[in-house]
Swiss-Prot record:
Keywords: Ribonucleoprotein, Ribosomal protein. The keyword Ribonucleoprotein applies. Belongs to the bacterial ribosomal protein bL34 family. GO terms for cellular component: ribonucleoprotein complex; ribosome. Gene3D superfamilies: 1.10.287.3980. One of its GO terms (molecular function) is structural constituent of ribosome. Residues 1-19, 26-44 have a biased composition (Basic residues). It holds the Pfam family Ribosomal_L34. This is Large ribosomal subunit protein bL34.
Amino acid sequence: MKRTYQPSKRKRKKVHGFRTRMSTKNGRRVLASRRRKGRKVLSA
């Protein structure tokens, strides 16, 4: 059976990257909540 996680740098950036997060209102909300929580890493 194929595993669910098939790593790809391109996909990772496209789906979870900082610029992608910044491009939508909800994405900015995600970053804001992670800043508020004090995450060391905000996005992939």
